[in-house]
Amino acid sequence: MNPAHLLVLSAVCVSLLGASSIPPQPLHLVQFNGMIRCTIPGSIPWWDYSDYGCYCGSGGSGTPVDELDRCCQVHDNCYTQAQQLTECSPYSKRYSYDCSEGTLTCKADNDECAAFVCDCDRVAAICFAGAPYNKENINIDTTTRC
């Protein structure tokens, strides 16, 4: 086999091994990602919001660093409220919604939990779209800034 082909094949195999270690995202996060992309076309939500400020990403504490971080805090609080509903798990609940020209609508066929979670995500996506994105708030030291 040609050494160049062998090198390319090896690189592909290593890439695939790395990709297989990435855990799948819960369906709801895929839906929330879609909502954000509806309100902010061209955004890459997993990249842009997974480690922003004190509240965007997993966990959250302290004082939000800016308006966008406050959107994430409100979203976290909304999920806490959703968990008060009977058998409602906002991190895994699937819901139905439409996106039309940047406008999000939660569908009427959602059950109570799905409607609540859908609205949490809809409000957050709209909030993200209206908030400035400050690159200096990416990957901050949460022990000193939050």
From Swiss-Prot:
Any one GO molecular function term: phospholipid binding
GO cellular component, one term: extracellular region
Keywords of the record: Blood coagulation cascade inhibiting toxin, Calcium, Disulfide bond, Hemostasis impairing toxin, Hydrolase, Lipid degradation, Lipid metabolism, Metal-binding, Secreted, Signal, Toxin
Residues annotated as binding Ca(2+): Y55, G57, G59, D76
Coiled-coil residue spans: none
Cofactor: Ca(2+)
Record's function text: Snake venom phospholipase A2 (PLA2) that displays edema-inducing and moderate anticoagulant activities. PLA2 catalyzes the calcium-dependent hydrolysis of the 2-acyl groups in 3-sn-phosphoglycerides.
Name of the molecule in the record: Acidic phospholipase A2 2
Source organism of this protein record: Ophiophagus hannah
